[in-house]
Structures are given as C-alpha cells and as structure tokens.
Amino acid sequence: MTSIDWRSALTDDEQGSIRDIVAAATRHDGVAPVGDQVLRELPADRTRHLVAVDPDAGAVVGYLNLAPASDTAPPMAELVVHPDFRRRGTGAAMARAGLAEGGTHARIWAHGNLEAARATARTLGLQVVRELLQMRRPLTDLPPVTVADGVRLATYSGPGDDPELLRINNSAFAWHPEQGGWTDADIAERRAEAWFDPAGLFMAFDDASGKLLGFHWTKVHGPDLGEVYVVGVDPAAQGRGLGATLTLTGLHHLAERLSNSPQPTVMLYVEADNGAAVKTYRRLGFDVSSVDAAYAAVAD
C-alpha cells in the first residue's frame, strides 16, 4: 500500500525523484503538472512537502507541494503522480490531505484541467474558483514595434535595476496572488535560473525623468517555444501604449532567438476574468491553447 507522509524538507534523492516524476508526467500529459515555483521550492523549507512512496517499487511515485497563505493568496497546493502509478487513488488521497492541511480556504491547481483532475475534483466535491488561460501565437508576421515620444527602451543592466523593477511589479500586480509582493529574493532566484537572459528583460524609461515606466521579462523554454513571462506597467503610466510596445519588443526578440525553429511559438498566461488583457492579447494574435484551474472545497 502506498504510504503518504509530510516532510518539512526533502533529501537530494527525493528532489531528484520528484523532478523525474514531473518530467514523466509532462511527457505523458502534454502539460507540466506543476509550475516552475514548485521546482524552486524543492530544496527549500518555505513550503510543505507531501510525498507518496510505493513500497513494492521502493520509489517516490507522487508529490504534493503546499504553499502557505500570503497577503495576496490563500494556501495553494500543486500535485503530480507518476503516470505508471495512477488510477490507484493516490492522487485523490494526496489532494484530500493537502486541502485538509491547508485549511478552509486552501486551493489546488489542476494544470491543463485534464479529465483525471476533473474526476478527482468531482470525487472530492471541489469546484473551480479560478482559471488561468495559456494563450499562444506563432512568432511570425509580427506587427512592428511603435515607441512613443519620450520613452526609451533598454535591457536589464544588473541588480542595480532591481529596486525599480520591484516598484513597478508590486504596484502593477498588487492584486495578484503569485506575482504581487515580490522581494529582492524573488528576482535573485529567477536571475539564477538557467533560462535567465538579461538581453530578454526589456525596460521602458521616461526620457525626461529617467524613471522606469514598465518592463517585459521574456523566457525561452527550448528551441521552439518562448514565453511572455511578465509584462508590468506602472499604473500611473497607463494609457501610453507601453504594454503593447513592451510586449511586441519582447516578441520580436523571441522571434530572433528562435529563428532556427521551423515553428517558433510564444506563450503567455493570463487570468481568465481579466477581460481587458485577454482582449489585448487576442488583438496581438494570441489564442487560448489550454486552461489551468484552481479548485477549492464547496462552501456549506
């Protein structure tokens, strides 16, 4: 019988096994079962770790990460079970344990909202409380970039830019459960990632004052796929077309980075209920490719 136990910290071997499970599930499902932040948390002790071990296989076969509540987000769980060990009730048992540990307001992500996740949600009496759209478009036939008078574009020059990046990010995303409330450590962690490229972090400055107005952080996932990772604009600078300028600047950069691909593609994530942003991205040629759903217990 599979054992399921909480850990405050993971061993190196457990971390390696979990990364392997995530990779296997991604290949099997066509969508990553957990977000990048979960992988960053594996060696840390900021979150809780629920590990499922199959005694016959002598191996980790499932993992749930439980992030504590923050000022902008409730407790959030993310879950993966190895494809070879599914349909045994492990996923449902882990989801039930994670939500119980997280408390009344806890939520659990279903990346791609696949049928298996929907079935588990029905079994546990959960309902969708939030949806995140993944949108994509080809990196071909891009509109030209237009830069307004008085705006200067540059790329990230190093940690000296971080205070202004944090100011813009935390004002633009004060409402956002994951993106809001960043600290220096959040930028430093991402700067240490293998994918980080300072030439792909674009910044728009006001020529007169020198103040940062907005930024677009791009990400390359592989030879065929790039991402609009974050676009943030100072709320005080809204209405100047900066979002479109920064987005298109990043798209042209990604198109150049992926120029050897026969089908270069860019993706982004946007809240399903952010109608204005969805409309803007549709105008730029993006279409919905998948939906991530956050589930929570139905209130009595």
Curated annotation (Swiss-Prot):
Pfam family, one: Acetyltransf_1
Protein name: Mycothiol acetyltransferase
Source species of the chain: Mycobacterium sp. (strain KMS)
Family: Belongs to the acetyltransferase family. MshD subfamily.
Repeat recorded as keyword: yes
Quaternary organization: Monomer.
List of residues binding 1D-myo-inositol 2-(L-cysteinylamino)-2-deoxy-alpha-D-glucopyranoside: D36, E178, K219, E227, Y269
Encoding gene per record: mshD
Annotated acetyl-CoA 1 binding sites: L79, V80, V81
Function: Catalyzes the transfer of acetyl from acetyl-CoA to desacetylmycothiol (Cys-GlcN-Ins) to form mycothiol.
